Amino acid sequence: MISSKPRLVVPYGLKTLLEGISRAVLKTNPSNINQFAAAYFQELTMYRGNTTMDIKDLVKQFHQIKVEKWSEGTTPQKKLECLKEPGKTSVESKVPTQMEKSTDTDEDNVTRTEYSDKTTQFPSVYAVPGTEQTEAVGGLSSKPATPKTTTPPSSPPPTAVSPEFAYVPADPAQLAAQMLGKVSSIHSDQSDVLMVDVATSMPVVIKEVPSSEAAEDVMVAAPLVCSGKVLEVQVVNQTSVHVDLGSQPKENEAEPSTASSVPLQDEQEPPAYDQAPEVTLQADIEVMSTVHISSVYNDVPVTEGVVYIEQLPEQIVIPFTDQVACLKENEQSKENEQSPRVSPKSVVEKTTSGMSKKSVESVKLAQLEENAKYSSVYMEAEATALLSDTSLKGQPEVPAQLLDAEGAIKIGSEKSLHLEVEITSIVSDNTGQEESGENSVPQEMEGKPVLSGEAAEAVHSGTSVKSSSGPFPPAPEGLTAPEIEPEGESTAE
């Protein structure tokens, strides 16, 4: 009788394969048999690709090579982790290995070291990108590779840059060059800058001296700024004297006068006041001076105009542009006048020195007073004085002196010239008849221009002159400016 039940045919090698997986499960004892079985067959398939042999021999050899290692517990955990996601097993198992190898290479260490050095040198430019890239590199690697970056090997000195460079702009080279340029401009050529400022701050009028007196003339240059800055004035002559002149600010100082200038007789017309020329030394025996003076009587300005002062060997003539004041010396006594007198006359002062002085002054205020024995002229102006003095010829060389704290000038010789900013000229009829106890005259400033011997008179804008060879009368009351006290006629007579 024929049975209707079909006959099942077992494929070749199925029994051997099932026996192999059963042995592997028994030896390794995995927690998840399904994942382990999948990993087993995957490894077996990969292993079979390398060899072409019978299934029985393949399973037997696979057990000897792979399953025996799994039974020791070295790789089953890794196999189980790989079995969690069978589709990504190969990718995940290879990427961490490659990153680990890349972080251990020498090239990676070198690049990270150089990058850290750059970050230290230029934090303002590379700090943010460096941080982002470091974080990116750390995120790509499965193992922490930051210790190598945080502790780089010994680096060159640029890593020891001071922290202040971390806050400089993006281009520190330009900033440094700019700062150095400013410093050099401040510290270089200070005298030139001062001279330029002075020259442009006030008009300057220069008169030429006749050729017959050129050998003996001395031009004094005293450029001053109305704001009261202390400037350096060089007095150069045959004795090469260096004088420093200081100015003090006054309440009633004003802008330089722009009144039209009236030339003296037999002299050239002064240049226009368009732009003040830069003061320079004309010769070894010439010095140019520009002084700002202001005259006040009882804190009230008296007159304003342009004054040209010409001092000849026997007289001083001061013609004014708007108003000309004349003050003649009288031997007879007159009562002291408290109020200033201004009259359209020329000012004449007899002098005893054989020197010839010519000065052109731009005057703002002038005050004239007559006393019993004194003649005074108060002036405050900006002037350029050309002085010719024969008594200065042949004097011993006087070294340059520095300006003291009070703005006075000290020259260590009796035959010296002291210059000041303010001027008050007092002429005495008979200074020789005065008592010897009145030699000293109170001055608002310590510096006094002193001319030796015959040089008793001088008209300096912003200066005071005192003769060293005769007594001096006391200053009259009610005067607000320093005084010029030239020696009287008694020395010549």
Swiss-Prot record:
Listed result of changing T146A: Does not affect phosphorylation
Mutagenesis or variant effect for T159A: Does not affect phosphorylation. Does not affect phosphorylation
Tissue expression per record: Expressed in elongating spermatids and spermatozoa (at protein level). Isoform 1 is expressed in testis. Isoform 3 and isoform 5 are also expressed in brain, pancreas and numerous brain tumors.
Modified sites of kind Phosphothreonine: T151
Swiss-Prot/TrEMBL keywords: Calcium, Cell projection, Cilium, Cytoplasm, Cytoskeleton, Flagellum, Metal-binding, Nucleus, Phosphoprotein
UniProt signal peptide: none
Subcellular location: Cytoplasm, Cytoskeleton; Cell projection, Cilium, Flagellum
Ranges of compositional bias, category Acidic residues: 484-493
GO cellular component: cytoplasm; cytoskeleton; cytosol; extracellular region; motile cilium; nucleoplasm; nucleus; sperm end piece
Modified residues (Phosphoserine): S155
Polar residues biased stretches: 90-100, 426-442, 461-470
UniProt protein name: Calcium-binding tyrosine phosphorylation-regulated protein
Taxonomic source organism: Homo sapiens
Gene label: CABYR
